[in-house]
A protein has these predicted regions:
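Metal-dependent peptidase/peptidase-like ectodomains
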Residues: 145-187
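Zn-dependent metallopeptidase/amidohydrolase metal-coordination segment
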Residues: 211-249
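Short acidic/polar active-site loop segments enriched in Thr and Asp
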Residues: 106, 207, 226
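Active-site/ligand-binding-proximal alpha/beta "capping" segment
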Residues: 171-207, 265
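Non-catalytic positions within long, well-ordered alpha-helices that form the structural scaffold/packing
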Residues: 101-104, 202, 221
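Metabolite-binding pocket within alpha/beta catalytic cores that recognizes anionic/polar moieties
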Residues: 1-156
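His/Asp/Glu-rich mid-to-C-terminal helical/loop segments that flank catalytic regions of hydrolases
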Residues: 238-272
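Generic non-transmembrane alpha-helical segments
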Residues: 13, 17, 163, 167-178, ...
């Protein structure tokens, strides 16, 4: 369970460094951290300086909080996220979302790099998350509930806000960006899925599978933050193509689509 005292300690540290008051948060997935470099007047705070923050060891993830502005909006960006497969607790994985809420964030964009399960999709596509499937039997809200942070029994019928999704769709159409829509399945990792597991995941109704996003989205929902999720489909999931999977492929594909990704996210933020 997240402790209010810990959240406030982290908040006080950030506010002692910058007077920028962010209303929009973004969590940047593997290979997508370059968006943070587009923020104007940015302040960079290493995770190691923030109390109660973990540090990601995943390739493609820096470890700093970047606070600045874009499109006339103040933004706090996580340049690097924490993954459950790294051995962090779900409290550690999701603590940054609690900090964002304390800093004043009202809307959150969660991004990730993941594998395409839907065979109509292709590597390099962007996918707007419409819903998710939690395959892990874990939930960041397990344990005592602090009513100051959110309700005990959370309605998750609309984790990914419809109004915000409509904005993203409108931006993609205006910019002639191909934007898929689909269901994201959370897989703990760090192993990729087996071909049999991918067949199961497809049967369950997922269009993409990855190792993040769902814990943060659930805590954002619990905190009352309107959330939207955007996936960069960096590879076809295991067994679809006759080739092995690698994290290098994930980073390489994310690099190729970063300009399109930045354009979509920047314009979306300006319309929030």
């Amino acid at each position: 369970m997240h402790k209010m005292a810990d959240i406030l300690e982290s908040k006080n540290l950030v506010e002692s460094i910058t007077n920028i008051k962010p209303t929009i948060g973004i969590i940047l997935g593997s290979g997508l951290g370059s968006f943070a470099d587009t923020l104007e007047g940015a302040v960079h705070i290493p995770y190691s300086n923030i109390p109660h923050f973990a540090k990601s060891e995943a390739v493609g993830h820096s470890n700093e909080l970047v606070i600045g502005s874009i499109g006339g909006k103040n933004v706090v960006a996580m340049k690097g996220r924490f993954h459950y497969y790294e051995g962090f607790t779900l409290d550690q994985v999701t603590f940054p979302v609690r900090l964002m809420k304390a800093l004043g964030v009202e809307k959150l964009i969660i991004t990730n790099a993941c594998g395409a399960v839907n065979t109509d999709f292709s590597p390099g596509d962007l996918m707007l998350i419409t819903d998710h499937i939690n395959l892990t039997a874990n939930n960041p809200l397990i344990g005592p509930n602090n009513p100051d942070l959110g309700v005990r029994f959370l309605d998750v019928s609309e984790v990914y806000n419809k109004a915000l999704r409509s904005i993203v769709i409108g931006v993609a159409k205006a910019q002639n960006i191909t934007l898929r829509q689909g269901v994201y399945a959370w897989w703990t990792g760090p192993t990729y899925e087996t071909p049999a597991e991918i067949r199961m995941i497809r049967t369950l109704g997922a269009d993409a599978v990855g190792m993040s996003t769902v814990p943060e989205a659930l805590i954002a929902r619990h905190a009352g933050i309107d959330t939207v999720g955007i996936s960069c489909l960096t590879n076809m999931a295991c067994g679809i193509l006759d080739q092995p999977l690698s994290h290098e492929e994930v980073i390489e594909t994310a690099e190729k689509v970063k300009a399109t990704f930045i354009k979509l996210v920047a314009e979306t933020i300006s319309r929030f």
